[in-house]
């Protein structure tokens, strides 16, 4: 086969020779070309130098960025607080015991005459109160109303004042007088604006408690428990609160103090009906705690059910 180059000259066209197949050992090291895995020693050195410099620069940039980020973060307090944070300024109200078995929901069902059933709830409360009962080695103070405290002071939650809701009384579960422990969720820097006098929306029993409490001791986030949606009011005439019907204001604000424990209110139901579901709603009362009883958007309150078999 020939072709004309445009000037009358003739030449032969040659097909390219197929590449010589390399053996596996030649792919690793080719002595003729002096290559190792297809690269010469110089080429490998240049490649290694490039990636070494590349990753050193990358690590340096990452370190600079992390240092810049960490310089804006405190080990002791969040950067965004209260209304600037996702948590906001409205603490939620929680309760214990709460079963780890999700199918139980918020129902506390038991028969005090059946040890296995009552012991289940007693053990849950024991676990919850473990930190409250073992405060050895912590820098804590026994606080009181009117006492001058430093912002970093941590006040003791005295479980000896829980009365009928004490460990010695099995939290009332052996005598069908169960106790529920209420606590406010911690919000950094939140300070309660308390009601030092009764409000028209408060239940009558809470109004009575406030009026009978000394003025200096009214600095509390009050709590009340009644029938959810106004039900079963007749079954809420015989309940007690320990050590008082509120969370004392001297426990606040929470500033991430070492050893801090949220205050508790123990609520004992002395005569719950047997064989009937008691639907309970407990509410926290403070000027800066919003309340909503909505199922989808509950605020400042919590609901649970008690069922004595």
Curated annotation (Swiss-Prot):
Membrane topology qualifier: Single-pass type II membrane protein
Entry's Gene Ontology BP terms: intracellular potassium ion homeostasis; intracellular sodium ion homeostasis; monoatomic cation transport; potassium ion import across plasma membrane; sodium ion export across plasma membrane
InterPro entries in the record: Na/K_ATPase_sub_beta, Na/K_ATPase_sub_beta_sf
Subcellular location: Cell membrane
GO cellular component, one term: plasma membrane
Sequence similarity: Belongs to the X(+)/potassium ATPases subunit beta family.
Protein name: Sodium/potassium-transporting ATPase subunit beta-1
UniProt organism field: Drosophila melanogaster
Gene it is expressed from: nrv1
